[in-house]
Amino acid sequence: QGLYTAIIAGFFISFFGGSRVQIGGPTAAFVVIIYGIVEQYGTDGLIVATILAGIILVIMGICRFGSLIKYIPYTITTGFTCGIAVTLFVGQLKDFFGLEIASVPSEFLNKVIAYVQNISTINLTSTIIGVVAIIIMLFWPKVTDKIPGSLIAIIITTAIVYFAKLPVNTIGSVYGELNSAFPTFHAPALSMKLVQEMISPAFTIAILAGIESLLSAVVSDGMIGDTHKSNAELIGQGLGNIFSGLFGGIPATGANA
């Protein structure tokens, strides 16, 4: 579902959004919200909430709510960016160290506790491969900046694992064979009761998506010396989430690559 969201929502957010360099797709900030909605209302509930959130975001953009971004203190922007970085960093530790955990908690502190409790399952081979990848990414720019170091790291470490037949998890071993078919239109099973129940989660998704995308756009502005269009960004986010939901995707927002 995340891949479908990156394709569908990513296209609409990039095409209609107001930032030249910001990408769109599912982000770590939505994990807790998505988990709660699916647990209580199922996949159809999440799809309805995503579509409603998209409609709310479009309305916010039309009403020019994006202009309010200028009143947000810069310290919030900095803290927000650091928070995302820490969340993503901690989220990758399980796979980096090859820890064997049946179910990883979605909450930050519980996730850290689970890592500590299962530290004895560390896979040294997986850790070494991860370290090699980091070293390549750090030092490759000294060789050339025409090819991204991350791409070179993926190619080299994948080749090492494949030819040496190292005992580490791969995308195939963890997720199985990926569906190569393009996502199809999916109309959720609607009922007035479900729509009413999804209004509150939809507002939560819309507000979080709006704030995250606009703050990320501000960060992107600082990187390239440009100014984004806040209201257009909200409309793009809204359209991205509407179509993401219609094709069975999950909530999406703008983010820094």
Predicted segments with their positions:
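Transmembrane helical cores of multi-pass ion-transport proteins
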Residues: 1-257
